[in-house]
């Protein structure tokens, strides 16, 4: 018989619970089972800190619970997405983690893709079974030239490829939001990245409030909001819990979970790699904060978690993946993720064109 995803996690939990349990450490898991799994209410900020502080031997049970929450409140399907950068490098913002900033001595140089290349990438993405294709630009916000290119790209892709189109173009004006919605953009990505209290440590050229304004306009226009996190930048566990709670309050459709991959030439190039067990705790915590949200594996997981950790995360609350490469770093081969989903008996979400 094939091994199911639930069976695999139960095996992990059995091994963990053979050791003596520390009552105080596990109490939050009992609370979460009743509050999140049974009632569908996410953990609050103070509760999330306890998840992030769980001892190592409690991680399998936390992941098991997060997986059960995901299955009950989101279903079995895993959403697959590909991303492409229409404009790489030369960004005027100073996000300390990003090698695309033109303010740092980074090896990334400015590059524009033409429309035929975007269409080709969309076709290749759809061929993997992906239902989402996100067009990304390294900008503070789009100018008229970029908006015109986006419109042309959307039209061409829709003519030739059955896939939902998402965009990530920085901060938007109301007019730009309305245009993207009118053009049929399915989902818009604009990450909070980190907690409000830590944001000034990693970005100084724009404010947290400016990011929130774009997120609010996107939701009001009827597009799905994709709003994610980048963890492992030196934030405290309390700030990690703060971020999860702030994202939960925003109620995005999707939260991509990134782990810092320190890039040469950026202010965070010497930041240590996040511990894999801390990453797994974070995955469980974010799922328990947002039981109904699409929680997507995004950048840095290959470095932080490796193959085994990637598997554990998919059995611990993750229900979406980005296949292939990222914007400036290499990802896992698409087939590696797709084969893993088959092995775990996790069906890929089928394409349904948004209206």
Curated annotation (Swiss-Prot):
[2Fe-2S] cluster binds at residues 134, 167, 226, 296. InterPro entries: Aldolase_TIM, BATS_dom, Biotin_synth/BioAB, Biotin_synthase, Elp3/MiaA/NifB-like_rSAM, rSAM. One of its GO terms (biological process) is biotin biosynthetic process. Its cofactor is [4Fe-4S] cluster; [2Fe-2S] cluster. It is an enzyme of class 2 (transferase). Homodimer. Belongs to the radical SAM superfamily. Biotin synthase family. PANTHER family: BIOTIN SYNTHASE (PTHR22976), BIOTIN SYNTHASE, MITOCHONDRIAL (PTHR22976:SF2). This is Biotin synthase. It comes from Paenarthrobacter aurescens (strain TC1). The gene is bioB.
